[in-house]
Amino acid sequence: MIVGIPKEIKNNENRVSLTPAGAHELVQRGHTVYIQHTAGINSGFSDEEYEKVGARILPTIEDVYAIAEMIIKVKEPIECEYNLVRKSQLVFTYFHFACDKELTEAMMRSGSVCLAYETVTDKQGGLPLLIPMSEVAGRMSTQEGARFLEKPQGGRGILLGGVPGVKPAKVLVLGGGIVGTNAALMAAGLGADVTICDISLPRLRQLSEFMPKNVKTLFSSSHNIEKELPTTDLIIGAVLIPGAKAPHLITRPMLKLMKKGTVLVDVAIDQGGCFETSHPTTHAEPIYEVDGIIHYCVANIPGAVPCTSTLALTNATLPYAIRLADLGWEKACENDPGVKNGLNIVNGKIVFPAVAEAFGWKI
């Protein structure tokens, strides 16, 4: 199969979807790998490293899309890429269709096959291609939240962990999955007073068994969340419904319950966001204020640490990329229902129910 790796062009997206080691694996199996010029440079990989393992370098993104049977990316195609995607071309990446109608319609028009990292499942029903970036995003959400609590960044001027004789900041984490767990552990490690909410009592029991003593668990309800808001300094939204739009757990009227300068970090923004007042931001302009509350809603948080996140991502995606290249998408999906769950759009038709439901469409 001919595999194409375009350079990511989303704002400050520094990851690359295939490392030289991954390219080597594909080339050794008889596949042809084309890499766009400097696609790996921000993750620490030169064109020469790719060429040494048998990959070929192409000068432009148009060249890569034109020749490849399978495109492997990190983030969804953006508007200038829509017309480059071809009929029957397999595109393997994070899509997050449920919060982006324009992208969804563009991929339907293209007639391509869209296989989304975020809905591929394993035998236990887990999300193996979402986990590594959720781990990175969870940890970074605490780091970024702590940064924007600082006075020069517009925050209230609070040190997350406090010091002896001074109380630490209070952190509220909404969602006890991979993102929320990593966010809570990072905040706890810095010494914050942490509360983590979830709607699953079994999950809360699990969390209470291994979380440090400065982490409390709380059943997630509007009433319980509202009670926490007046004393909380940093709120991290880490809600996930696979492939679907995130629910709004904090509404605009609830902002009035918070202290001015409270920081909201919405990690669910790539699925529409779990705060009513959220809209996507970029690493170049990461924050904005609503009613005196700081919102951090960067949709590609791991893109800021590409030397870590590229390796974490490709460790997970490479086995699937190899299977798709070896077998083709139809046979790969036939052999593994988990891969089939990754199919969101096939030849112009939505095949993933949560995406159709997000727009009120029928499959």
Residue ranges and their predicted role:
Residues 209-291:
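Rossmann-like adenosine-cofactor binding region
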Residues 2-110:
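An N-terminal-biased, well-structured beta-alpha scaffold segment characteristic
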Residues 118-144, 148-159, 269, 274-363:
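Adenosine-phosphate binding glycine-rich loop
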